Swiss-Prot record:
The lineage of its organism: Bacteria, Pseudomonadati, Pseudomonadota, Gammaproteobacteria, Alteromonadales. This is tRNA U34 carboxymethyltransferase. CDD domains: AdoMet_MTases (cd02440). It catalyses: carboxy-S-adenosyl-L-methionine + 5-hydroxyuridine(34) in tRNA = 5-carboxymethoxyuridine(34) in tRNA + S-adenosyl-L-homocysteine + H(+). GO terms for biological process: tRNA wobble uridine modification. It comes from Shewanella baltica (strain OS155 / ATCC BAA-1091). It is an enzyme of class 2 (transferase). Catalyzes carboxymethyl transfer from carboxy-S-adenosyl-L-methionine (Cx-SAM) to 5-hydroxyuridine (ho5U) to form 5-carboxymethoxyuridine (cmo5U) at position 34 in tRNAs. Homotetramer. Belongs to the class I-like SAM-binding methyltransferase superfamily. CmoB family. The gene is cmoB. Keywords: Transferase, tRNA processing.
Length: 331
């Protein structure tokens, strides 16, 4: 069974220690709720990942574990077969002992767009909301973060993350907890909070922004990346049914509307640092994710539109700072 005890020990004497009042019981319930289904099968695969400590790691320019020279061809083939049992791999890529996990998303491209605009992560405590399998968490660690905590309720993402961590070394201060943000108390503790690719999946985007704010210390930085549309501060797309074949997209605001929402939620120093139309090469079908991908979500006759006729995915990155608490918002 995946254990979170090392995380509990690490935060026991930190500014996250009050989280221990509720976290163990919440995660214990999550484990009991997932005693059946795929999790036990994936945990058996994790228990087979017994390999020597890697001769090198790189989290600065990529997520690379091992040079590729440590394992024999047979050992490498066995490892690849084990890692393929965690398919589909959506966020990456990862380079593990010479094995290239070519994920659906080129998450490194997103990181390259974001990293130049954020405050330096050196010695920061970081929260990554909706972290997927943890690719960006490793890059945050490579940027000097003191501790990185990711939350994502998916059992598969947790097991993919655990696979990489067990191969990279469990001593690294990066942790994935299978939680949604609504399960977090107001921690007011993180120096930087990332929410990338989450906001449009939330039924109440304002509540999501307030939940993000509640995790930051005063003066902490929010890095928000989400789908946007063109338009003024009153422009918000509410898909009638599906958007890009996704049935869980609720609100897609314009950049101006999103910045207004952040201001209303008592953020300050709000700025849009990047907008980017998602390229077909950034999200695509691969050998490690053989299902439908972006090209199938777009109109085959006009890739500037989704199959439903909405504007094709365009993403913006907004950076904002948590202001002093506003008692009107708290109440």
């Amino acid at each position: 069974m995946i254990s979170f005890s090392s995380f509990y020990q690490q935060i026991a004497d930190s500014n996250l220690q009050h989280w221990l009042e509720t976290l163990p019981s919440i995660l214990g319930k999550w484990q009991r709720d997932h005693k059946h289904g795929n999790l036990p099968k994936w945990e058996k695969v994790l228990n087979k990942l017994h390999y020597p400590a890697p001769d090198q790691v790189d989290f600065i320019d990529s997520v690379t574990v091992g040079s590729g020279e440590q394992l024999s061809p047979g050992e490498k083939e066995k490892l690849e077969n084990l890692l393929r049992l965690f398919m589909p791999w959506r966020k990456g890529p990862f380079h593990i002992h010479g094995i290239h996990i070519d994920t659906e998303w080129r998450s490194d491209w997103k990181w390259d767009r974001v990293k130049q605009h954020i405050s330096p992560l050196k010695n920061r405590t970081v929260l990554d909301v909706g972290c997927g399998s943890g690719y960006h968490m490793w890059r945050m660690l490579g940027s000097g973060a003191k501790r990185v905590v990711g939350i994502d309720p998916s059992p598969l993402f947790l097991c993919q993350f655990e696979a990489v961590k067990r191969l990279a070394g469990t001593h690294h201060p990066v942790h994935l907890l299978p939680l949604g943000i609504e399960e977090l108390p107001p921690l007011d503790a993180f120096d930087t909070v990332f929410s990338m690719g989450v906001l449009y999946h939330r039924r109440s985007p304002i509540d999501h922004l307030l939940q993000l704010r509640d995790q930051l210390r005063t003066g902490g930085e929010l890095v928000l990346e989400t789908l946007v549309i063109d338009g003024d501060e009153n422009a918000v797309l509410v898909p009638q049914d599906r958007y890009g074949k996704m049935n869980n997209v609720w609100f897609i605001p314009s950049v101006a509307a999103l910045m207004l929402w952040l201001k209303k939620c008592d953020f300050t120093d709000i700025r849009c640092v990047d907008t980017d139309v998602t390229a077909l090469a950034e999200q695509r079908r691969t050998d490690w994710m053989p299902n439908e991908s972006l090209v199938e979500y777009l109109d085959p006759n006009d890739i500037t539109k989704t199959v439903e006729g909405y504007p094709a995915p365009k993403r913006a990155t907004i950076i904002a700072v948590k202001n002093q608490p506003n008692q009107d918002l708290i109440s």
